[in-house]
Amino acid sequence: MPTFNQLIRHGREEKRRTDRTRALDKCPQKTGVCLRVSTRTPKKPNSALRKIAKVRLSNRHDIFAYIPGEGHNLQEHSTVLIRGGRVKDLPGVKFHCIRGVKDLMGIPGRRRGRSKYGAEKPKSI
């Protein structure tokens, strides 16, 4: 416990906040190229095969990004747009791919939550 005089002389050191999305360089999104597309199993108690892509961003950072939605057309060398946002049950996956931008297609035939998955507006009858 510092004395009052020590606090006047030195002050308190502020805690540094860690940046969870350091690879984005303070940008809202970044583009990147897929190095590998694979699946990964989540932590307990969940069970699935979550689709992820290893992406090299335009600033040369290599990251893992989650591919949301059902089905995708990503391959090696596809370009994608990346945003922040972790996947709670996949350790080390702190980014999401944005659907409907660059080489990652939106989900055809999706009617709800279309903006999150880059889906076209359905034709009204």
Swiss-Prot record:
Gene Ontology CC: one annotated term: mitochondrion
Q: Which residues cross the membrane?
A: none
**GO terms for MF:** structural constituent of ribosome
> Could you tell me which Gene3D superfamilies the record lists for this protein?
Nucleic acid-binding proteins
A GO biological process of this protein is: translation
- What are the alphabetically sorted keywords of the record? Mitochondrion, Ribonucleoprotein, Ribosomal protein
Tell me where it mainly resides.
mitochondrion
A Pfam match: Ribosom_S12_S23
What is its subcellular localisation? Mitochondrion
Q: Which CDD domains match?
A: Ribosomal_S12
Q: Report further notes.
A: A stretch of 270 kb of the mitochondrial genome is duplicated within the centromere of chromosome 2 resulting in the duplication of the gene. The expression of this duplicated gene (At2g07675) is not demonstrated. It is also probably not RNA edited and therefore differs in all the positions known to be edited.
Question: Sorted alphabetically, which NCBIfam families does this protein's record hold?
Answer: rpsL_bact (TIGR00981)
Q: Which PANTHER family match?
A: 30S RIBOSOMAL PROTEIN S12 FAMILY MEMBER (PTHR11652)
Function per UniProt: Protein S12 is involved in the translation initiation step.
Q: Which family does it belong to?
A: Belongs to the universal ribosomal protein uS12 family.
Q: How does it assemble?
A: Component of the mitochondrial ribosome small subunit.
Q: What is this protein called?
A: Small ribosomal subunit protein uS12m
Organism of derivation: Arabidopsis thaliana
